[in-house]
């Protein structure tokens, strides 16, 4: 049996010399993967329970190992556990401590198991929990948006294309577009849970094991749906990491787009919203400044999340199938993206909770830029049997006239309109009211007030 002396790595009986200081520095991952300690302990407990059930170890050994593992968990939770970089990672640190607590019988914990399947089991369990936590945080920000939307159904603002006034919309409808984005993000993360539901434990290094183990038992104990099918693929698989990183990248992109929009709306040129003092900073030289630094932070961090996805893709693209040390970086990459994304969701949630719409400025801007021109074209089609392209040309002529006269469309009188289209009556003037314009878009998914109320209720129920 291997003598697990304190100055020896677990595999020290094969490698006769200590690793160089440089190798120890770059090769150990304990500072990163120690957050897997609970998953590692749970996995080991399930494993030894299975070994006992299959008559591979005795009842006494099983209980001693579980006692030692529970003691280690308490030490870590109370910050009394001493991590040693010599033992590379959390898995070997825990095993080394287990030897110190219960002696040589700790060696049975690794029966029918390799670090390869141990690591990926821990990692999948951690990623499952992280995925569910992100979905909770997305639920929270959706609830925030729904609350703001309920208060602003009849708050009118311009909708933009190319950052130019396009058509009038409800501020609530604009906000509800964010709900759709985050709901898709939730669906993506939820879909990822399926690939995380297969249990790697028991495939050992890459070929499985000659021991009569029960992988269905450990799957059930650890919350997996089923064991993986192929031992080689199991050890090599990091698709679930890519799935997480891709989902995080798309969600970060949504957050960045929203942040960019809020920055623009908060700018002096637009002044559509006011940000709370809680989420802005000042200038070191300009006393009047209130800068949207947190929103700018969200934009910037999106690049890091993107970079992590491409880092992982690049690591994997050159690897033959099975395990290689290159894969050690997978956890640092995923942990970082997870941290950034959760922070970003929390920051945006805080910004939105304290955001104040400048309703009069929104309305004033909605009344500029000939924003009801499309409504006029639609009116001509519906009321004068005019082909849309002809209605488009007629409306363009009216806009050109208003522009020449330096008037808004709602400032034109009926006589001026009849000069261009004689069939128009005074009824057409209602078309130029932006509130009427917004409320007329009754097609499913449109910006009418009833549509918005129904969509808010739909999401509140789910």
Swiss-Prot record:
Q: Where are the transmembrane segments?
A: none
Q: Which EC main class describes this enzyme?
A: lyase
EC nos: 4.3.2.1
Which compartment or compartments is the protein found in?
Answer: Cytoplasm
Listed GO MF terms: argininosuccinate lyase activity
Q: Which domain of life does this protein belong to? A: Bacteria
Annotated InterPro entries: Arg_succ_lyase_C, Argininosuccinate_lyase, Fumarase/histidase_N, Fumarate_lyase_CS, Fumarate_lyase_fam, Fumarate_lyase_N, L-Aspartase-like
Task: Extract the SUPFAM superfamilies matched here.
Answer: L-aspartase-like
Q: Which PROSITE patterns match?
A: FUMARATE_LYASES
Biological process (GO) annotations? arginine biosynthetic process via ornithine; L-arginine biosynthetic process
Q: Which UniProt keywords apply?
A: Amino-acid biosynthesis, Arginine biosynthesis, Cytoplasm, Lyase
Question: Does Cytoplasm appear among the keywords?
Answer: yes
Query: What Pfam families does the database record attribute to this sequence?
Result: ASL_C2, Lyase_1
GO annotation, cellular component aspect: cytosol
Specify the pathway: Amino-acid biosynthesis; L-arginine biosynthesis; L-arginine from L-ornithine and carbamoyl phosphate: step 3/3
Q: Which reaction does it catalyse?
A: 2-(N(omega)-L-arginino)succinate = fumarate + L-arginine
CDD domains linked:
Argininosuccinate_lyase
* NCBIfam families, alphabetized: argH
Which HAMAP family does the UniProt entry name for this protein? Arg_succ_lyase (MF_00006)
Q: According to its UniProt record, which protein family does this protein belong to?
A: Belongs to the lyase 1 family. Argininosuccinate lyase subfamily.
Q: What is this protein called?
A: Argininosuccinate lyase
**What gene name does this entry carry?**
argH
